Amino acid sequence: MIGNRKVKDVNTVEDPSNLSPATWRLIDTGVSDGATNMAIDEVIMQSVTEERSPPTLRFYAWDPPCVSVGYSQSVRKEVDLERCRERGYTWVRRPTGGRAILHIDELTYSVVAPQGEARVAGDIITSYRRLSLGLVEGLRTLHGGVVQADHMEADGGLEKSAACFDVPSHYEVTAYGRKLVGSAQVRRKGGVLQHGALPLEGDVSRLVDVLVLPEPDRAALRGKLLERAIALDEVVGRVVPFDEVAEALTQGFGSALNLEFTLGELSPFERDAVEGLMSRYTGDEWTHVK
């Protein structure tokens, strides 16, 4: 047990030899704004589901920094938009569930596959657990203390906040008993999209500055996040470059899930579809529907 969470050795969870070999597409789309990043993820999901594209592992980053909220959250109720403007942050509503994340100084991954693909088959928690194996396997090449934790409920009596990294999830990726990767998943029309944020460096409590909170609650949540979340630089003892982390995760997914990857890019169909979705992710009808 680490902290208040049970942990399992990743090597005991699932034998990758049980999965038939497969080849997926690997895409690094670099840096984009929040609306573009969410549009790309949704379009890849559509393209893979329609068999226009193969299952895809994608890496990306965000500029300007962006607060994303889960599908069921309310931007206006959870996020102080004036505080965001003062700091140069944007905001976007994700197609996936979960809670708010400030995307800054991070690597984001996304996995898209048909629901029948063995690596995402089963219910959401089963597939989340399986995909976490790839994250853990890759991050362990950077530091051996990264583990996959059993699901544990939040401490009794403490109200859950709007922040993703404050809320324990099933089989989360942790180091030193603190959450290292925050992931969320959605299933639609036979496809699965899971994406997640890995803070590479910096203060993991910065999100607190832009949430709608009374000042005493803001200070309390900041303390909780610093206790419950961690950035990769604190784990490894150095700032690991984006490309090095992406390479480690690619190898981890390959080893843990018996995958090979073919380096690719967005197809012409996907690029055109992203342009068509931009008005949705930048518009009030989607962003402020809750």
Segments (PLM) and residue ranges:
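A glycine-rich, hydrophobic loop/mini-helix early in the fold
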Residues: 78-120
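Active-site loop/lid in soluble adenylation, ligation, and acyl-transfer enzymes
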Residues: 10-78, 82, 86, 90-94, ...
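Short connector loops at helix/strand junctions that flank enzyme active sites
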Residues: 62-64, 86, 102-106, 168, ...
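Catalytic beta-strand/loop module used to bind and position nucleotide/cofactor moieties
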Residues: 115, 119-255, 284, 290
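Gly/Ser/Thr-rich beta-alpha loop segments that engage phosphate groups in nucleotides
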Residues: 72, 99-100, 184
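Extended cationic-aromatic binding surfaces that line active-site or macromolecule-binding grooves
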Residues: 62-75, 107-108, 112-115, 130-137
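Short polybasic linear motifs
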Residues: 5-7
